[in-house]
Amino acid sequence: MKKLLFVTLLATLLPAGSALAGETASEIAVLVADQSDANGNPMPTTPAITGVVGLLAAETGLNLVIHPYPWRRAQMLAENGEGLLYGAAATPERQRMFNFSKPLYAASQWLVTPARSTLSFQRWEDLRGKVISISSGGRYGTEFEEHRGKTFTVEDNAATIASRLKMLSIGRVDAVMLDSFRGAAQLEARLNCLYPGDGKWTVVDKPLDTEPVLLAVSKSSQLNSVLPTLNEAIDRLAKSRGIQKLLEKRLTATSC
């Protein structure tokens, strides 16, 4: 059984006037992509995600509970209205199916290569003929989708970062694309710490794109009723820089 990370709020911390004070709030699933380490063992949800969800829970009084799943399954559950999908890009295809929150923060899309076989990216033409590993079921910004299958091809059958990096190490793909709020050097150091292998990983200096990290909710879901509450909380956290301060703290962390 998957471990659930409960993000709850004591009644004394509820916002003034909250209708949830003094009672147990209904659980709201926050669906995130699961990950495993280099040996295939499940990894806990990243501190950045748990921290952001915790801030939202504290700011709204909602009982937000993180549920890690393979990304394709997380999307299917969200489409069925069974939770909030964390981190899905607002592509035209998804906009027909989901409503989206205001941006939580920004994340860049970085290319990772073996240090022994780097590539340069300044324009999309630099990726002509390349095979790029993306997250299973991943969809991205307009430019990426325009070049997908034309300038370059994608491989999206590997579900975890560890399995994607394994494909990269044996030459099945030319690069792995990862989303992160970190800069290139910081992400590179983290990957080499978490996924040490025969060689080192290099992150290409220029990102493919930078997009907002959003929460998505199916248009047919009753969870649309909490979207205004979440957006108001996101506005308050933006003014207080609560999320930004949390991410900055993660950038200075000494552990992986």
Which role fits each region the language model picked out?
Residues 7-16:
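Bacterial N-terminal signal peptides
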Residues 21-97, 240, 249-250:
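Extracytoplasmic small-molecule ligand-binding "clamshell" domains
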Residues 32-35, 107-110, 193-231, 252-256:
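Periplasmic-binding protein-like
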Residues 33-37, 42-46, 90-91, 115-118, ...:
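Short coil/turn segments
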Residues 47-59, 125-131, 212-247:
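Extended ligand-binding regions for polar small-molecule ligands
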Residues 51-60, 102-103, 137-159, 165, ...:
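Ligand-binding cleft/hinge of the Venus flytrap
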Residues 59, 68, 72-83, 99, ...:
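Short helices/loops that flank or line small-molecule/ion binding pockets
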Residues 66-126, 137-140, 205-208:
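Acidic, polar ligand-binding/catalytic clefts
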